[in-house]
Amino acid sequence: MITGRDFIITSLQSWDIAIGSNAKDIAKEISRHNRVLYVNTPVDMLNYLMHSQSPDVQRTKTLIKNKKNGLRQITANLWTLDCPFCAFPVNSFPDGFLFDAVNRLNNKRICKHILSAAQELQFTNHILLIDNDIYRSFYAKEFLKPRISIYYRRDNMTSAFWKKHAPRLEPLLCSKSDLVATNSPQLAEAVKSYNSNCHDIGQGVDLESFRDG
């Protein structure tokens, strides 16, 4: 069991999601013996304009208006972080240079906000866990400089949201991660060629085999 470490978790699933969330369950389990900062992905500008009454947009508006950093303490060892800004809606961009350039800007801004919160919490030598967030965490390893970077794959990437960019980006994200974890043998087999340090952990979060010493 890993204890006494600092974890930063980036996920597409908002902490305030009404339904059950595998990402939240993982964060809660890890926080039993470690400190966890769970990052809610920012609202993009398109959703900000088109879905102004949604809870995520309303929360973003409140943060911007009150000039708050969005850091909330959930338990003694667990915090969530909202972003007081909007991200560029890059998913509609053609795949290639333009997408990469703007996506990197999104990543840089998000990670700058994360680092500010991590510094406030006095996180050190943190472990980064990217929960299926291929786009907005693609450059997180470079910008956050974690002690260990883990990509957790729990989706087949077959939905329309992933079709344009994920086939190119996911192999790259797998390759540069220190390890890849999946929740099924099939998902592990699909990406094992990109990273030999790939493990099927089912629905659990036992990270003992990933200990870095």
Label each PLM-derived region with a short phrase:
Residues 96, 107-111, 126-144:
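An aromatic- and histidine-rich active-site surface loop
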Residues 50-120:
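A conserved catalytic-core segment of Leloir-type glycosyltransferases
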Residues 186, 204, 213:
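Carbohydrate-associated surface elements
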Residues 26, 109-119, 123-125, 161-183:
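Membrane-proximal helix-turn-helix segments that form the acceptor-binding/catalytic region
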Residues 1-23, 42:
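Nucleotide-activated donor-dependent transferases that construct or modify glycoconjugates
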Residues 22-30:
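Short amphipathic alpha-helix
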Residues 138, 177-200:
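A short, active-site helix/loop in glycosyltransferases that binds the activated sugar's phosphate group
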Residues 7, 127-131, 141-157:
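Active-site proximal beta-strand in glycosyltransferases
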